[in-house]
Design a protein with these regions (language model features):
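Hydrophobic/aromatic-rich alpha-helical bundle segments in the mid-to-C-terminal region
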Residues: 114, 118, 133-183
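Amphipathic alpha-helical packing segments from all-alpha helical-bundle domains
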Residues: 64, 95-101, 109-136, 140, ...
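Helix-turn-helix
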Residues: 8, 12-54
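Hydrophobic alpha-helical connector segments
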Residues: 54, 68-98, 149
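Short, basic, alpha-helical segments at the C-terminal edge of helix-turn-helix-like DNA-binding modules
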Residues: 57-64
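Short amphipathic alpha-helical interface segments enriched in basic and hydrophobic/aromatic residues
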Residues: 18, 22, 64, 68, ...
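Short helix-capping/turn signature of helix-turn-helix
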Residues: 45, 91, 103-109
Length: 183
């Protein structure tokens, strides 16, 4: 039996994807990172394709749950939900922009991954739209505000903007006013 667990292989593959893209998610490379043999990999995965499928599923499940949890934790208080979502992005503790970016990079070369990203993006935008409805916006206005917020944040990371957490936190009230229309 392999002394390394399935989660360790998945986490190592996740880090490899972030650092090297899909080319880094090769069985030999992962085994070397872990100081294991190829055989250790096959205790848990049929092949590389299964590992990649599970990585994509892990991203889709965990990243969507982070957004949905904001709604459940703040009981339809839109401004609290907005700030919780902003903190989720700014803190970069639970939400990992590098992980998100690695999946988006992969989606540029895989139609299957692109479709999963599209579904996740729609779910995330739906959560943001719900937040804006809780603030008091309806219909297209709630949707557009949600899209602007989401596209802004995804673009922030895609552009590689470099600001300290304190710089980002200092801007939160201004973004809040611009995006929610509230102080």
């Amino acid at each position: 039996m392999s002394p390394l667990g399935r989660e360790i292989w998945l986490e190592t593959a996740r880090r490899a994807l972030i650092e090297e893209g899909t080319a880094g998610v090769e069985i030999n490379k992962l085994a070397k990172r872990l100081g294991s043999s190829r055989g250790g990999f096959y205790w848990f995965f049929k092949d590389r394709a299964q590992l990649l499928d599970e990585l994509l599923e892990l991203w889709a499940d965990t990243s969507t749950v982070l957004f949905e949890r904001v709604l459940h934790n703040h009981h339809e208080d839109g401004l609290k939900e907005y700030l919780a979502m902003t903190n989720l992005w700014v803190d970069e503790e639970e939400y990992d922009p590098k992980w998100d970016g690695a999946i988006r990079d992969w989606a540029r070369t895989s139609e299957v991954v692109r479709k999963v990203v599209e579904v996740v993006d729609q779910k995330r935008i739906a959560v943001l739209e719900e937040i804006f409805r809780h603030i008091g916006y309806q219909g297209k206005e709630a949707n557009v505000r949600a899209r602007v917020m989401y596209y802004h944040q995804v673009g922030y990371y895609a552009m590689g903007v470099r600001e300290s957490q304190s710089e980002r936190r200092a801007l939160i009230p201004y973004y809040k006013r611009a995006l929610t229309g509230r102080d």
